[in-house]
Amino acid sequence: MNIQERFSLRKSAVGLVSVSLLCAIYTSTVAADTVVTGVNEIIEESQVKDEVSIESEKNESLDGSNIEIVEEIADNIPSPVIAEGEVAVEMKVDRGTENVVSRNDTEVTTSEQNQIEVTETKEILNQTSYQTESGEQRQIIWAHGITPPAMEQSGGFVKEKYGDYLNYTAPFEAGKGYYDTNKSLNASFIDLNLCFAAVSSNMVHWWLEQNSSYVERYLKEKKGTVNVEENYAITDLRRYINSFQNQQNSRVFDMFKTYYGYRTNGFVSDALVDLFINGYKPKAQGGVNLEDSQLVPDSRGGFFYDVFKEKKLTNRIFSGSYERFGEDVRTVLESKGLLGLTYRTLGYATHIVTVWGAEYDNQGKIKAVYITDSDDQQEQIGLKRMGITRDASGNPRLNNHMKNNSAGALLDYVHTIRLGQDLWEEYFNPLAKAKETASQTLADTKKALDLSIQGQSELPESMRLIYLEKLNNLYNQGILSIQKAESSEMLSGALENGLNSLKSLDFPISEVGNALAPDLPVGDRSTVSDVDSLSSQETSSTNLEADTENAGIIADGTNQLHFPVEAQTTSSVEAEGDNVFEQEADTLPIIIENKDEFGSELSRNMQTSETDSLVVAVEEDVKNDEVAQVEELLESEKVENQSSELLSDTLIVESANDKEEDRVEAVVSEQPDSIPHQNVEISLVEPTNVETETVVTPINDAATPHGSPTYIDNSVTESVATPLEKDSIQAGETEIAEPTSSESTNVETETVVTPVNDVATPHGSPTYIDNSVTESVATPLEKDSIQAGETEIAEPTSSESTNVETETVVTPVNDVATPHGSPTYIDNSVTESVATPLEKDSIQAGETEIAEPTSSESTSVEAELVDNSEIHAATSSVTPCGSSAYADGSTTESVATPLEKDSIQTGNTEIAEPTSSKSTNVEAASVDNSEIHADASLTAVSSVNLDNPVIEPVAISLIGSKRDTNAEVEVSSLSKREVRKTNTDGLISVQSKVIKKELLESSLAEAGSPLLEATIAQSSNSNSTEIGMSYQNTVLLESNNTERQVSKAEIVMEHKETELVETVSSASEPVVLVENISQTSNNTIESGKNMGVQSQAGAKQILGVEQSSKVSTPTSRQIMGVGLLTLVLGSALGLLKKRRK
């Protein structure tokens, strides 16, 4: 396909050449020549050569019925036009050239009714109006600086009709303000696809001409004189000033051809304009340039970078709907802009033309655009009128079809450019822009006061006119002062004086003042009766001072004034008729961080519904005495609840604090009735002072029936209940230092409860919901056993004052439905428990029940650290009436038993449970340099000092079941901690009680070894297993005041190969292996490598341990040790014999 055919197909898309015509001559070559036969009479000639047969061309060539070319009407009445294209068709036959022209004389008339009447031309918007043949009034908005073409008789537009297509064209006229850069006459390949560059060239030429005064001034400052005839370099701006000579000669277009010639595809016009003005380098894919303050101008352009910097003058928008497109085009033209319009031709190919004007009907709908096209170089055409129609889908189309609105070409993008004269002014006269801004500020203030004066209905009309006249005089004086300012300092002073003079106008605004209502307690309100001036407002009920000198006054068009009021102690302003603050106190969630002092700042902007009222926006400070009721439970009620909870299987962890004033918090938890060994006994030998502080926050959006106190905790809770002497506890990102006390116990319990949403709790069921990070430290003990995490916690009492027998079972619960009277605790948090500073004792944690090894003169330490263990709550759980549930869907960490000068570091190790008669056996699972990865919301306890590191989490899991094919023992580590022994003289013996339902086989190891009896108890209610050691099994050594080191011990427990204990189960055989590596200078025990036996899927692991401690003397301890050992050996042998029988 040659160039002419390609151009013809492109023009057919917009109706300049009939599609039926092209189909008829699908193999023909159309060469268009224009022959001027008379004034305002253009006859289009075309040569049509049939490549198939000359005879068919003689007999079947197109005649007048196929195409009708009509001479331009004398009065040149424009009508809907569609596109650019071939203007004439010349037919050649064997007898010569025959012009097939059918002239409709009925359309060629010069009557006045068909003459275009130019009714008005607006200089500012450059508009012209005319009347169509049918009598419709049309308006044309031209681009800024355009001299509209002649629309009267003898005008330049030619009317051409091709079947149902109607075209109007006009020849190019230089000096009319518009530009028509065309491609090469021979359609050279260098600019074959540079229609985008031609449009960019037109825009640049127009922009340079309209900004000629600024450009000349700029060139004089930068380059000196400009000689247009001189051949400047391609990168010299002076080369392109007044460089458009004709449609085929444009230096700007030549530059773009140099940079973008020989392209096989198109590009975007706005990118090239940005290159020329700012120096933006066009993006490879033609993306829109984003303003970049760090812009470095491209060396090929950026001719006006000093003026505009990174501020672009171009834009690219999608054509959108028909209505939107018409509004966008109008907006651009009326704002002194120019457009490039892209439309689709065949397939996805597009073409772009320059828009110089737009035509609208009397309803404001766009009907046509006036364009120049770079592809009409073969014709003497400048402007073309192309119709705009709305197709069936509501999209705009470039369409010259007179009947079918859905014909023609779909529009694509619109590229725009503006003059940027405001930026020119800022560059040459920075003070001018500042004056404009100052004048606008003064005008806005004047308008606000004007509306305020007119809105005073009680003010007599005569007085109103007097105030308005005074206001106008003050405003004019201020504007005059601003215009006379010769520097920025003078301008600032003039603006300030002008604003002050306007504000000094004193007129009564009592009615407006009625809208000012200070914030009072709910149910009481008052109004402001006396307001003396705009600069000072005083209220009768509240000291409300509004400094209007610093307040921006803004009018909103409905006779309302907005005064941003600044006040130190203000309240929300309430409009008359609006009940803004009538809210229930219990529906406002308030978090109290300090029980003595708290405050909340609420900012509200209120607007009155009346049009003549004043609206004041203030900031509200709520005082302490204005806060809604927050504390619902009294201290006595809390103590009562604690007592009742102790009687109903609730564990309350208490701690002693003798000298140091540390903040103590307790975590209260309960366990279901279905789990055995739930009795909790806390006995205090000496008087215990209990201080309970409870901060209860009302629940928001919670359905809580009558009498059911609900406590929700979504916060970060750290409970410290065990002052440890010379020991520090570090958990996650929290470090706790605890002093110890051996005498009276002072317990301060503080429970912080924060709100939760959408909790339904039946009548009388206290519910505790905790989604927080919890750290608990409990019961200062010197020699004891600790079980924390999701375990039963046994915490003995101190040596001289407290005997504690505790047990805690943590049951995972999610989606809890709590019946009547069932206190429920839900915890989706990271829990850290720190308990019972022990000297050389057993530490147990994490879904485990630990039995202490039996020894007469030895110290055993059994430790297990659970590494990153996650306890996932069950999907659904129902707690029976009267039971208590504690749901924990989080990571549990237990910290227990700081041992003196010992560091227990555990890794992925399994359980070792030794017994020894004369040696010190230490069992620990440890890994060096392990770190706690606590929850991100975990925060440090500010009231606790850090002295010495202690064990973080300690836990041992030993699980076995006769119904399980596998049992799993997992020992892992969360952190490395050092354990230091406290200087104590007392002795604590720990007795572990385990209720057993089924007794499995047990075997003895060697003759000299004490018996370790392992039992597995199957719970009938919870399908959980409990594994315990002996009924009474542990006697600890007496601790000395001097520090001593724990001797090395290496214990290996292995299935069927252990030297100490072999535990045999009917259905499962847990294998436990502990490697004791070595003891460092500070008695660090490291062990690793564990082997676990997995428990049956779905089985819950709930272990219970009851421990009690008694105070004994060294002599009684030895006697008790012998007795206990004898009792254990005897009972074990008896049971074994009975079992074998």
Swiss-Prot record:
Residues 518-544, 725-749, 781-805, 839-860 are annotated as: Disordered. It is a single-pass membrane protein. Pfam families: Mac-1 (PF09028). Residues 1-32 form the signal peptide. GO terms for cellular component: extracellular region; plasma membrane. GO terms for molecular function: cysteine-type peptidase activity. It is found in: Cell membrane; Secreted. It comes from the Bacteria. The active site is at 195 (nucleophile). Disruption phenotype: Cells lacking this gene lose IgM-cleaving activity and show an increase of surface-bound IgM antigen. They are also significantly attenuated in survival in blood of a piglet vaccinated once with a bacterin, in comparison to the wild-type. The chain crosses the membrane at residues 1119-1136. Residues 738-749, 795-805 have a biased composition (Low complexity). Its EC number is 3.4.22.-. One of its GO terms (biological process) is proteolysis. Residues 526-544 have a biased composition (Polar residues). Keywords: Cell membrane, Hydrolase, Membrane, Protease, Secreted, Signal, Thiol protease, Transmembrane, Transmembrane helix, Virulence. It is an enzyme of class 3 (hydrolase). Belongs to the peptidase C66 family. Catalyzes the specific cleavage of porcine IgM bound to the bacterial surface. Can degrade only IgM but neither IgG nor IgA, and is host specific, as it exclusively cleaves porcine IgM but not IgM from six other species, including human, mouse and a closely related member of the Suidae family. Promotes survival in porcine blood. Is thus involved in a so-far-unknown mechanism of host-pathogen interaction at an early stage of the host immune response. Domain encompassing residues 35-432 are sufficient for IgM cleavage. This is IgM protease. It comes from Streptococcus suis (strain P1/7). The lineage of its organism: Bacteria, Bacillati, Bacillota, Bacilli, Lactobacillales. The gene is ide.
